[in-house]
Amino acid sequence: MERLFKHICLVARHSKPGITPALMQLANHLAAGGATVLIDKESVTPDEANGYPLIDRTDMGKLADLCIVLGGDGTMLSIARLLAPYRVPLVGINQGRLGFMTDIPLHEMLDSVDAILHGKFVPEDRILLQAAVVREDAEVASALAFNDVVFSRGAVGSMIEFEVFIDNQFVYSQRSDGLIVSTPTGSTAYSLASGGPILHPTLQAIALVPICPQSLSNRPIAVNDSCEVEFMLTRGLDARVHFDGQLHCDLMEMDRVLIRRYRNPLRILHPEGYNYYDMLRHKLHWGERLI
């Protein structure tokens, strides 16, 4: 059977102990099967690359028709934001801790990747968020987020105050440590730790989860992902907005942050037999069936 993907980019976290041999094992295996292998230049040194082309991460979406990440969810997040504009699918090999998105164990890497290349996979489209920071009617920053956009206080110990709007309708004002605006993918990350709901990845929803609100009546809510969410900082020093916990922008009072669903979803390819609830039970150590 002809392989579906011919140009494959490999990405790994170079600082992870033992990652380079696994990366090169996969590269050699793919090349032996006839694929054109590209390697992210942040993942290996030129000497380690063994002659494979090294490319910038910003070029992955233009040059590859599949990207395989060896690492944890943090690496997946950074690559997801780069690939989404190009609709390039993503496969995750688990080298991290929890690995909610990297669902292929290392010892099954070669067999699972071969199956995916021959069309045996479970595709899943997941939304991203597009956020813009507006100051005095001018956009001063923008970014994509695969997990969440987090509005929070900085190093100063006091709470911040802000107002929240959905589709230009006032929802509430809040005094708290901040607010998490989460995708379904991000609902098992910071949002979950803050008391937010777990959202199935295919659910067309966005969760708004307060961080340590002063009023106990401020509870998480979920809205349709077609909505535009806006929050405005009304009082607070050293406040910031974070994108997937990897990028951030410092805020000033009266700054507004506008958040909406990004136009392109990201497609993740899972191995055959993937079951979301099995994954949750395993990763979160939920109780097993009694019979």
UniProtKB/Swiss-Prot annotation:
Protein species of origin: Chromobacterium violaceum (strain ATCC 12472 / DSM 30191 / JCM 1249 / CCUG 213 / NBRC 12614 / NCIMB 9131 / NCTC 9757 / MK)
Pfam family, one: NAD_kinase_C
Superkingdom assignment: Bacteria
Active-site residues annotated for this sequence: D73
Keyword Nucleotide-binding: yes
Localisation: Cytoplasm
Protein purpose: Involved in the regulation of the intracellular balance of NAD and NADP, and is a key enzyme in the biosynthesis of NADP. Catalyzes specifically the phosphorylation on 2'-hydroxyl of the adenosine moiety of NAD to yield NADP.
InterPro entries given in the database record: ATP-NAD_kinase_N, ATP-NAD_kinase_PpnK-typ_C, NAD/diacylglycerol_kinase_sf, NADK
GO MF assignments: ATP binding; metal ion binding; NAD binding; NAD+ kinase activity
UniProt similarity note: Belongs to the NAD kinase family.
Name the UniProt record assigns to this protein: NAD kinase
Cofactor(s) required, per the database record: a divalent metal cation
Family annotation (SUPFAM superfamilies): NAD kinase/diacylglycerol kinase-like
